[in-house]
Amino acid sequence: TPSYYEENEDGIVPDLRLFDGNFTKPAIPYIRDGFAHMKNLSVYGSTRFKLTDRLALIGGGRFVDWQYRYSSNRNNFADSRHKNKVFIPYLGASYDLNDNLTAYTSYTTIFRPQPRYLDRNGKPLEPQRGKTYELGLKASGFEGRLNASAAAFINKRDHLGKEIRDDEHQRIYYESVNNTTTKGVELSVGGRLSDKWLINASYAYSKLKNDAGNLVNPSYPAHLFKLFTAYDVTDRLNLGANVNWQSGTNAVSDEYQPLTAAGKEALTQRSYATLDLTAHYKIGKSTRIGLDFENVFNKRYRPMPDIHVYGTPRSLTATLKHTF
């Protein structure tokens, strides 16, 4: 017998222990939930001035005409309209310290619409606005086969969307947070150490805080490290490894207070690392077989600390590819 499930705004799931598989099809009338209309027109340009053999200035910008209208019948949400005409400048400078090392700095403003972030009244939040400052180094080696970079940045934004859980009404909405500051560092190296050895590694650190110095989104990791390497053992056989590591995260906030030790643990994901291995072998010119061993140590983790869905467990995938 066919069975159905009625989705409603209460978000109540029937007790599965009492469900016998037989449920009458509900009479659900078609109701238009609402509509959204967005228009985004932009014009951009850039130029570069070589002041000396080593010093260069870069300037540019983008003019944006962004319009958005949103209306929803759900929960009697009101009609919402946004119109913005914004110029986003970009300024930068670079200086060649030597043939293989360049220092740079840059400045730009931020305009980032967020039409999917609705406030408690069902209206989209104002676009994010702010400024970004960056300072860094770029280097090359091994006759241009290997590139590396290091950068530090400061990002200041207003109207940043913060997720709020409304358990009473079974919904999620967002509120704007102003005067936020993100400080971070990014390091990367990639290329070939030899004709047979490929490597790509990166590290990123960032923390987003409000004007009181508190973390705004602790559910995102402050530290991320990624390493991929592959080596041609022979002309036919290639072996690779991929490592991903991130620092701990949590979803503990005032919304869940008072919170027991067990509750805090349930909303916390400790730091973790995963390892993937690959092997690919060429059979002739047109055929290749491959083995992909994902999450070798079967690490159990949650990508988001407040969503109790675990990441991909240990798995082995074999592929056969032939090109005609």
Task: Identify the function of each model-found stretch.
Residues 48-53, 63, 85, 93-96, ...:
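Residue-level signature of outer-membrane beta-barrel architecture
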Residues 53, 154-156, 175-256, 285-288, ...:
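Gram-negative outer-membrane beta-barrel transporters
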Residues 1-96, 113-114, 118-120:
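Signature of Gram-negative outer-membrane beta-barrel scaffolds
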Residues 96-104, 128-204, 292:
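Membrane-embedded beta-barrel scaffold of Gram-negative outer-membrane proteins
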Residues 134-136, 311-324:
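Outer-membrane beta-barrel "beta-signal"
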Residues 47, 59, 91, 105, ...:
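Membrane-embedded beta-strand positions of outer-membrane beta-barrel proteins
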Residues 1-2, 59-63, 105-109, 137, ...:
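Transmembrane beta-barrel strands of outer-membrane/channel proteins
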